[in-house]
Amino acid sequence: MAAILNVQRIQNNQVTEYTMSPVRNFANTKDVYFDAQLTNIESKIDSSRAQIHLTIALKYNTNLPDNIFQAHFSLGNWQSDKIQLQKAPDKKHDSLNSIKYFYAFLDVPRSALAKKEINRFSNVVARVLRISFRLQDQSEKGNWSDYHLFDTVASELYATVIKETINFGNMIKINALDGSKQLTSSQGSFKYSWTMYDYRNLEQLDEVRNLINISFDKPVQIVNVDVKIHYVPTKGRLQEIKQQGEFENNLDVNEKLKLNLIGNWNFDKHNKKLISDISGTGIFLPQGGYGSYEIMIGATVGNDFYTIIANNQFKYETPLDDLEQNDFFEVNYLPVYSTYNFSDLTQ
């Protein structure tokens, strides 16, 4: 367990005590002082500019001011200065897990995203967004009693880098398991809400069937859905399943689209892969394993077309049919020679 960091700030003869305690990182693999995760992306592009609205979850436990953390963004040929993250007023912080939500708004010249002539630039383009984190300007470092806090925390901030591909052309990207957002389009504003199951700790007979539930407070036409599933069975190799199709599905206001896995699947133990089987189940790895899925939904809201991308992960902690991993116990029965002192339960 990492130690609690203590520091004093001395300013105008006033001493303020600050502490920073370790927290569990988002991957739940180690204790850290700082971690970050991108939970939501919305992007729009026109003839001159690209606009990106990001929701970032920061994980830390300190009484230091929230503006101590800043972010640096790069996208295509564009780079930002250090940007002060804005607290998300409409998202409830998770105090139990030391998670706070922040917004960042990026306004990027379209020319910075083009690799060649801009007149050949497609209306839909993919670029990698890179986010790195820094502490606030260190010019006042001399006012602090212990530089060690800054050095320790700064090293973790510098190591925390988020890379995410953004597909421009009215895109909504979802990484969180649930939430709701208000989005402004050329047709006005609309709200969308979603939920995905937490499949990261599946038990022996659990299956992955429901992929996402999403609704809008405006009528929506679903045009196409693509699903990519990647999984690695225990002692197996990376496998991929692709499902795609064009269909017309009109959703009324606040009607929920419940998107499930198409078809049934069975696990081929010899080849260690999932195969289509009408009598099978959803995604089920009886020998254990892990994986992820990505959903891409094409939807029309008013006169605007949106690409909605959602990601989720799944993992089986304990194999069902691996004798080396399961526990068994033996019961030795002792003979009863007398019923003396036993109660007669048949009375």
From Swiss-Prot:
Listed Pfam families: DUF5443
InterPro entries, per the entry: DUF5443
Protein name (Swiss-Prot/TrEMBL): Uncharacterized protein MG285
